[in-house]
C-alpha cells in the first residue's frame, strides 16, 4: 500500500474515533445503556490504532527534524554520524508502525470475537483414535484455562476403552474464535498405543471442528423440524443416578443432525445446551456454503477451516509436532501441555501476510 493511502485511511479511522468520543459525551446516549455500550466497544477497538497513528505522525516529524539538522551540520562529522544513527533508528520505528497499522486496517472476520463449540471426533484408528480425541480435548482445555477462558464439555460419547468417540466442548471468552479457528481439521498421531504389545507405531486420527456460537436471530430453527427424545442420565449422584430422564436426544430432521446432551443436571439445561450445539452446527453449514466461492479464490489461505483438511501430525517417537500448513515443526510435549501460542501465532502471522498481499493488490 502506498504510504499516502495508509495515512489517508488512518486519518479516517482517527476521525471516526473522535466522533465516537463526542457521542460518548452526549447525555442522550448516556441514558441509553445498550447504545452506550456499543459505542464504547467501537471506541475501544479503534483506540490502539489511533495511538499508533499518532506515534507514526510524531516519528515522521522527528525524521524531518533530523534531516534538517543534518543539513545544518554537514561540516561536523561527529554530529553527522550521530544524526545518521538516529535516522536509522527512527526509520526502523516508522517501518514497525507502518506494519502494525497496516495489519490493524485489514478486514476483520466478524466472527473472531465469538465463543465457540469445539467438536472433536475420533477418526481412523479404533480405540486408539478415541484415546487420541481425549488427549486433544485435554490439550485445548489446558490452553483455554491458561488464557482464562471457560472450558466445559457439553456433550460426550465415551469409548469403552477410554477416551471419546465424540466430544463437544463449550469454550467461552474474549476472541476465542480468532485463536481456535486455525485448529479445525484432521489431527494425526503417530505413537505406540498402550495396548500394543509388539511396540509397533500406529497412526490414528481425530477431527476437530471449530464452530462459532450463533445467536437465535442468525439461525432460525422451526420447532416442527425437531424431534426431541429423553433418556436417563447419570446425574449428580445418590438417588438421582439413572432414575431421572435428564438427557436430551435432539434430531434436526431437515439435516439429519443429532445432538445428545447429558452433561447438565436438568432436562431443561440439557435441552438449552443441545440447542446451542445445534445452532452452532447449522451456522457452520451456512458459513461453509457462504464461503465456498471465497475459499476457491484464496488457495493460499492458512487452512480452509474444513474438518477434512489434514493440518497437523504429532509424532511421539521424535517428540515432534508438524503443522502441514506452515511447513514447520514444533516440540511435542509443550503443545500437548496446552502451549499452543507459538503455532497459533504463526498461523495468524501467515494469514495476515496473505491478507496484506490481497489488500495491496486491491488498493494498487
From Swiss-Prot:
UniProt organism field: Prochlorococcus marinus (strain AS9601)
One of the record's GO cellular component terms: cytoplasm
Transmembrane regions: none
A GO term for molecular function: translation release factor activity, codon specific
Protein name, UniProt field: Peptide chain release factor 1
Signal sequence coordinates: none
Post-translational modification: Methylated by PrmC. Methylation increases the termination efficiency of RF1.
HAMAP family: Rel_fac_1 (MF_00093)
UniProt modified residues of type N5-methylglutamine: 239
Family indicated by similarity: Belongs to the prokaryotic/mitochondrial release factor family.
Amino acid at each position: 500500500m502506498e504510504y499516502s493511502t495508509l495515512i489517508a485511511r488512518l486519518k479516517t479511522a482517527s476521525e471516526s474515533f473522535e466522533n465516537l468520543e463526542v457521542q460518548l459525551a452526549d447525555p442522550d446516549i448516556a441514558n441509553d445503556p445498550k447504545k452506550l455500550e456499543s459505542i464504547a466497544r467501537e471506541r475501544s477497538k479503534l483506540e490502539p490504532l489511533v495511538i499508533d497513528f499518532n506515534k507514526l505522525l510524531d516519528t515522521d516529524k522527528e525524521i524531518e527534524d533530523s534531516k534538517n539538522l543534518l543539513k545544518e551540520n554537514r561540516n561536523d562529522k561527529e554530529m553527522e554520524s550521530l544524526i545518521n544513527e538516529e535516522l536509522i533508528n527512527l526509520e526502523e520505528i516508522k517501518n514497525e508502525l507502518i506494519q502494525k497499522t497496516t495489519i490493524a486496517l485489514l478486514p476483520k472476520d466478524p466472527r473472531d470475537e465469538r465463543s465457540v463449540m469445539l467438536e472433536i471426533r475420533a477418526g481412523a484408528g479404533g480405540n486408539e483414535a478415541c484415546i487420541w480425541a481425549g488427549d486433544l480435548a485435554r490439550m485445548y482445555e489446558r490452553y483455554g484455562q491458561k488464557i482464562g477462558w471457560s472450558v466445559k464439555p457439553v456433550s460426550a460419547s465415551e469409548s469403552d476403552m477410554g477416551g471419546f468417540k465424540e466430544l463437544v466442548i463449550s469454550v467461552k471468552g474474549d476472541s476465542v474464535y480468532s485463536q481456535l479457528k486455525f485448529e479445525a481439521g484432521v489431527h494425526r498421531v503417530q505413537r505406540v498405543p498402550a495396548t500394543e504389545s509388539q511396540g509397533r507405531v500406529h497412526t490414528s486420527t481425530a477431527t476437530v471442528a471449530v464452530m462459532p456460537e450463533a445467536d437465535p436471530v442468525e439461525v432460525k430453527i422451526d420447532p416442527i423440524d425437531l424431534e426431541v427424545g429423553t433418556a436417563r442420565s447419570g446425574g449428580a449422584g445418590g438417588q438421582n443416578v439413572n432414575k431421572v430422564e435428564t438427557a436430551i436426544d435432539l434430531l434436526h430432521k431437515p439435516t439429519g443432525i443429532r445432538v445428545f446432551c447429558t452433561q447438565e443436571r436438568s432436562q431443561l439445561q440439557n435441552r438449552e445446551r443441545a440447542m446451542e450445539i445445534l445452532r452452532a452446527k447449522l451456522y457452520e453449514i451456512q458459513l461453509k456454503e457462504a464461503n465456498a466461492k471465497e475459499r476457491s479464490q484464496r488457495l493460499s489461505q492458512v487452512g480452509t477451516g474444513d474438518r477434512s483438511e489434514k493440518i497437523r501430525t504429532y509424532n511421539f517417537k521424535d517428540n515432534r509436532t508438524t503443522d502441514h500448513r506452515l511447513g514447520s515443526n514444533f516440540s511435542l510435549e509443550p503443545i500437548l501441555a496446552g502451549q499452543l501460542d507459538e503455532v497459533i501465532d504463526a498461523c495468524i502471522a501467515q494469514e495476515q501476510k496473505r491478507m496484506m498481499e490481497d489488500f495491496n493488490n486491491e488498493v494498487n
